[in-house]
Curated annotation (Swiss-Prot):
The entry's keywords: Ribonucleoprotein, Ribosomal protein
Matching PANTHER family: 50S RIBOSOMAL PROTEIN L32, LARGE RIBOSOMAL SUBUNIT PROTEIN BL32
Matching InterPro entries: Ribosomal_bL32 (IPR002677), Ribosomal_bL32_bact (IPR044957), Ribosomal_zn-bd (IPR011332)
SUPFAM superfamilies linked to this entry: Zn-binding ribosomal proteins
Name under which the protein is recorded: Large ribosomal subunit protein bL32
The encoding gene: rpmF
Keyword Lyase recorded: no
GO CC aspect terms: large ribosomal subunit
Record-linked HAMAP family: Ribosomal_bL32
MF term (GO), any: structural constituent of ribosome
Pfam families: Ribosomal_L32p
A Gene Ontology BP annotation from the UniProt entry: translation
Family: Belongs to the bacterial ribosomal protein bL32 family.
Length: 60
């Protein structure tokens, strides 16, 4: 079984981890409802591309 010859330093470890980034989700403004929603998804009120395609979820 292979074993590392030397311990990985903090600098080496952190340089490798610089590529693990979180990106912000793309958000668009829906003119029909006046709310912001994520792209290519149905809004909470049931609209997609300005058309009503689903019933809105009932608030509990």
């Amino acid at each position: 079984m292979a074993v590392p010859a030397r311990r990985t330093s903090k600098a080496k470890k952190n340089k490798r981890r610089t590529h693990y980034k979180v990106t912000a989700p793309s958000v668009t403004f829906d003119e029909t409802t006046g709310d912001y929603s994520r792209s290519h998804r149905v809004s909470l009120k049931g609209y997609y591309k300005g058309r009503k395609i689903a019933k809105a979820a009932a608030a509990e």
